[in-house]
Amino acid sequence: MALELLTPFTKVELEEERKDKNRKQIGILGGNFNPVHNAHLLVADQVRQQLGLDEVLLMPEYKPPHVDKKATIDEKHRLKMLELAIKGIEGLAIETIELKRKGVSYTYDTMKDLIEQNPDVDYYFIIGADMVDYLPKWHKIDELIQMVQFVGVQRPKYKAGTSYPVIWVDVPLMDISSSMIRDFIRKNRKPNFLLPKLVLDYIEKEGLYQ
């Protein structure tokens, strides 16, 4: 099985390989970010640190194949909340390629375009442990695994296995979801400490998720 658990030895190997190639190492964390919350930021930052990446890009989807459009607010709000969430955070940035392209977002198409635009970059595509099980169903997955290195975020007590090459990273568990935050707001419960204060202030100012 091409299953790899991140260890100090693995990290050294990755760093030595990067020195030889002298290429930028960029992580990608895609999502609807409806809204972005602290667990998103924790995952992005921990993967960046543990793999020694130059940067992790948070990439909002325009119209993902698996999300009901009715449940997704306008992309201008999701983008603004991302901008507020990463303000002043080193090593995190935003990639808007899918918002600019519009239409349904397939990872293969997005990464193909990014690689063509940035031939000197190696990309690490970050997914949750539960998503690893679904890799065989991803659009053009066999081509995609030749283009990017998948990074699986390990969850406590969750054992995932795959025949695809995945680097596993352990990240502290934060049981937070965007749907939980939206539900809090609909019930007039303030979701303090679940997302950055600047994001919560924006949600309240714009009257989102009411």
Curated annotation (Swiss-Prot):
One of its GO terms (molecular function) is nicotinate-nucleotide adenylyltransferase activity. The keyword RNA-binding does not apply. It is an enzyme of class 2 (transferase). Keywords: ATP-binding, NAD, Nucleotide-binding, Nucleotidyltransferase, Pyridine nucleotide biosynthesis, Transferase. Transmembrane segments: none annotated. InterPro entries: Cyt_trans-like, NadD/NMNAT, Rossmann-like_a/b/a_fold. Its EC number is 2.7.7.18. Pathway: Cofactor biosynthesis; NAD(+) biosynthesis; deamido-NAD(+) from nicotinate D-ribonucleotide: step 1/1. It comes from the Bacteria. One of its GO terms (biological process) is NAD biosynthetic process. It catalyses: nicotinate beta-D-ribonucleotide + ATP + H(+) = deamido-NAD(+) + diphosphate. CDD domains: NMNAT (cd02165). Catalyzes the reversible adenylation of nicotinate mononucleotide (NaMN) to nicotinic acid adenine dinucleotide (NaAD). Belongs to the NadD family. This is Probable nicotinate-nucleotide adenylyltransferase. It comes from Streptococcus mutans serotype c (strain ATCC 700610 / UA159).
